[in-house]
């Protein structure tokens, strides 16, 4: 999904940086990847839901790990400004 957008080496480096459980840093992600909302929003609902967050690393590479439940909940809470359990495009870009 990211062909032509990111170099393979950059994708590998980003995945290696969060390969261990509970090592994902949502602040870094929001800062670096604001452009990728539409790709992470796999069902094209206009929102990123919990399951899409849990599995979003696999968008970069099929062999990537799923986020832990704790990482997913922290990530969702950080981006879900209005408390509806989803991250809308306006929240994602904020």
Curated annotation (Swiss-Prot):
Q: Where does the source fall among the domains of life?
A: Eukaryota
**What's a single GO CC term here?**
cytoplasm
EF-hand domain location is 36-63, 67-94
Which sites bind Ca(2+) 1?
41, 43, 45, 47, 49, 52
Q: Which UniProt keywords apply?
A: Acetylation, Allergen, Calcium, Metal-binding, Muscle protein, Repeat
Q: Does the keyword Ligase apply?
A: no
Q: What InterPro entries does the database record attribute to this sequence?
A: EF-hand-dom_pair (IPR011992), EF_Hand_1_Ca_BS (IPR018247), EF_hand_dom (IPR002048), Parvalbumin (IPR008080)
Post-translational modification N-acetylalanine, affected residues: 1
Which residues are involved in binding Ca(2+) 2? Answer: 80, 82, 84, 86, 91
Database matches in PANTHER family: PARVALBUMIN, PARVALBUMIN ALPHA
What family does the Swiss-Prot or TrEMBL record give for this protein? Belongs to the parvalbumin family.
What is this protein identified as? Parvalbumin beta 4
Q: Write down the species.
A: Merluccius bilinearis (Silver hake)
